[in-house]
Structure formats: C-alpha cells, structure tokens
Amino acid sequence: MWVGVISLFPEMFRSVTDFGVTGQAVKKGLLSIETWNPRDFTHDKHRTVDDRPYGGGPGMLMMVQPLRDAIHAAKQASPGKTKVIYLSPQGRKLDQQGVEELATNENLLLICGRYEGVDERIIQSEVDEEWSIGDFVMTGGEIPAMTLIDSVSRFVPGVLGDFASAEEDSFANGLLDCPHYTRPEVLDGKEVPEVLMSGNHKEIRRWRLKQSLGRTWQRRPELLENLALTDEQEQLLAEFIQETHHKRK
C-alpha cells in the first residue's frame, strides 16, 4: 500500500514510519509512506502557508496555492489511482467498517488540515472523501491521519504476523474483544479461566465468543443493536447475562 501525506509537520510521521508494526511494514516494503510539505511550494521568503478568511472571523485558513501545488505533486508521485482524503471534523466518523473499506485501496493521499481548515473549493475539487476520528476538535489532521494509517495498514497482507489478529480484534466482527491472559496462571490471587488451559479448541472458541458478546453488552450495548446475531450468539449472550445476574446475587 502507498500512502501520501500532505502536512505542515511531516516530521510527526516518523512515529509511523520508524516504529512498531507500521515501521516494520515500511522496512519490508509492504507499506510506503511519503510526505509533502506545503511550505516547500511557497514563493515568498517567509514561506507563508496561511491566509485570512473572507468574511472575517477568528483564525486563519491554509493558503490555497501552496496546498494545491502540494496535492498535485503528491498525485503525480502516486503509483496509481489514488483516493484523496481530507481529515476533518465534518467527515464520516472512522469505524472498523470504514477502516476495512479504506484498506481496499492500494493508494491513499491524506490531507492534514491546520489552522481553521482549508478553502471549501479545494475540498470540492481535490478531495474524494472526508473522514473524522471523532466528535472533538484537534489542532491539526496529523494525529487523525496517523490513526487512519495505523488501522488501515493492519489489513495489508503480510503486515501482521498472523492475519487472524486483525480479524479477531475488537470491532472486527462488530463486537468488543474478549479478555486475554498470559503467564503466570495465578496473579494476585486471580486465576486464568480453566477453559483456556484445557486444550479444547471448540470450548475455547465458545468461551471467547461468549465473553466478547458479554463485554459488548456491558460496555457498548448500542453495538448489538446493529448486529443480526446467530442462534449460537443469542444463546451465548443469554448465558452470559444469566451468569452475570447470578454472580450479583
């Protein structure tokens, strides 16, 4: 996967290109991340990248010319058809379904806004989609862009050692993840559930699914409203709820 980034602070993306799973993916050639700084496309000695908005008001907007030239340069460098994304509070909220949709693209170009945003005409002429990571305001689009890169790259073949990790993580099937345990068997008097040490893979799968359903019911019940549960899932959720009520008595 190729990802281009338009940012006034390209150095921030070293945390993605140099570290962790994404850093390893870059080293292996599975993920390519290139950055373009609008300051490099300015024509004045001050390298100005902001401008006053028409109509007045607080704050500044990103200057059109440097931003547009940076976008065009990035598009020309892209290895193929590219989806252009503007990280914006007005965009579609990123969720697991959105991540998987974006992961089907071989090339993405991410535009990181600053100040009060960008000229609406740039969005209309250059941007394919707007995406948001939540209903809150940040100082720029860099961290949302890094969030998108990290989540999408997990679905690039070979990035994760075990692709099942991506398929079984929280939200991958619309549910929260089940609890996980490692050594020691007893920690502060709390034991690992016996079923996980039984070696019975059928029962382990059943336990994990029940815990996943139960945790979703407890913490994010609204997620269940959008799911069509199978007969097995409905039975396991009912068992979990009954067991939970029994423990409270």
From Swiss-Prot:
Enzyme class, UniProt record, top EC level: transferase
Query: For this UniProt entry, what is the primary localization, expressed as one broad class?
Result: cytoplasm
CDD domains for this protein: TrmD-like
Q: What EC number(s) does the entry state?
A: 2.1.1.228
Which transformation does this protein catalyse, written as a reaction?
guanosine(37) in tRNA + S-adenosyl-L-methionine = N(1)-methylguanosine(37) in tRNA + S-adenosyl-L-homocysteine + H(+)
Q: Does the keyword Coiled coil apply?
A: no
Question: Which Gene Ontology molecular function entries are recorded, alphabetically?
Answer: tRNA (guanine(37)-N1)-methyltransferase activity
Q: From the UniProt annotation, give the residues forming the signal peptide.
A: none
Kindly state a single biological-process term from the GO annotations of this entry: tRNA N1-guanine methylation
Q: Extract the coiled-coil ranges from the record.
A: none
The protein's UniProt keywords, in alphabetical order, are: Cytoplasm, Methyltransferase, S-adenosyl-L-methionine, Transferase, tRNA processing
- Quote the subcellular location field of this record: Cytoplasm
A cellular-component GO term for this protein: cytosol
Task: Detail which positions bind S-adenosyl-L-methionine.
Answer: 113, 133-138
Q: How does it assemble?
A: Homodimer.
Sequence similarity: Belongs to the RNA methyltransferase TrmD family.
Known function: Specifically methylates guanosine-37 in various tRNAs.
Q: What is this protein called?
A: tRNA (guanine-N(1)-)-methyltransferase
Which organism does this sequence originate in? Answer: Vibrio vulnificus (strain YJ016)
The gene is trmD
